[in-house]
Curated annotation (Swiss-Prot):
Belongs to the TrpB family. HAMAP family: Trp_synth_beta. One of its GO terms (molecular function) is tryptophan synthase activity. The gene is trpB. It comes from Staphylococcus saprophyticus subsp. saprophyticus (strain ATCC 15305 / DSM 20229 / NCIMB 8711 / NCTC 7292 / S-41). Keywords: Amino-acid biosynthesis, Aromatic amino acid biosynthesis, Lyase, Pyridoxal phosphate, Tryptophan biosynthesis. PROSITE patterns: TRP_SYNTHASE_BETA. InterPro entries: Trp_synth_b_CS, Trp_synth_beta, Trp_synth_beta/beta-like, TrpB-like_PALP, TrpB-like_PALP_sf. It catalyses: (1S,2R)-1-C-(indol-3-yl)glycerol 3-phosphate + L-serine = D-glyceraldehyde 3-phosphate + L-tryptophan + H2O. This is Tryptophan synthase beta chain. Its cofactor is pyridoxal 5'-phosphate.
Amino acid sequence: MVENIQTEADAFGFFGNYGGQYVPETLMPAIQELKQAYQDAKNDPQFQIELDDYLKDYVGRETPLTYAKSYSELLGGAKIYLKREDLNHTGAHKINNALGQALLAKRMGKNKLVAETGAGQHGVASATVAALFDMELVVFMGEEDIKRQSLNVFRMELLGAKVESVTEGQGTLSDAVNKALQYWVSHVDDTHYLLGSALGPDPFPTIVRDFQKIIGQEIKAQVHEKEGQLPDAIVACVGGGSNAIGTFYPFVKDDVKLYGVEAAGDGIDSDKHALAINKGKEGVLHGTKMYLIQDDDGQIQLAHSISAGLDYPGVGPEHSYYHDIGRVKYATASDKQAMDALVRFTKAEGIIPAIESAHALSYVETLAPTMRNDEILVVTVSGRGDKDMETIRNYMKQEGDTHA
């Protein structure tokens, strides 16, 4: 057991030094309303029953824990299990949170949603639940991401969402969050901000974490059923950090090694990366204090990753806290390392992972061979690679791969 870990935000919304509510005064009533509504929902067994029913019959939970026999043999060392979030309806972990927050919005009497999206997966998940519950949805998406993920844009529109292109800044996820927050400020009476990652002002990091912790809860039960023990190590990719915090949270007080993998882009020594923890420092963005990529003057730097879902310049407050206390080790994977792992894994297991998930797999390739073959390593496959086929093909063409 690992003792003395803060597992809930304090009264001011902080995990250690990170978190808080750095928002304009105009938003505070909405934040307080959300916090109260969430507390009420959390204490209402009926809310949880309704959520569980939708997760089971609509999303398709629980997701399998698949033994990666060929990949384990290829790498040598640990026995590798895959947590298959790629098999959720809509193809990623994002639906867990979108569904929970949509039910919460309904409970608050709000029939309109606003969301941000990077890779488009959270946008698709949000559009899906908006269609399911007959709610209006506006999605803000960076211009650059719209180019990279045109198929997901069409999916969102087909589902009835209005997709707004964000041209400010770098035209990526960070800019989309800015616009979504601005929109929420002016439509706060009838609109809920369906934030997609474990960031933003308190209570968002806690809400998103709680709706994603089903990943880790299922892993714990499934490994116990298959192996009669806890896993020895768990690996997940980290952008804003929602799939990773959902994976790690049920294990933070257990004797289990936890590894988050950040996107190193062109490389850890380049200036094109998304290494908020490994190369960033403390700062405030989008309503919360967390690790951020900044220059020497404290200006927030542009994040870069081949994965549209990981190119965010910060990492949520709970991850920032776990890094500081040494509970989670944050490793890195470059674009090349992630893509190489993606190809190896796909050929070994017949599963095409999202590029985000391939960052976690890249670190598995480093970690697994250092472990004994009776040790258990679980990696969260946060999403499937369908949305990334164009990016993968273009990358392989550039690399001169004959399969592209």
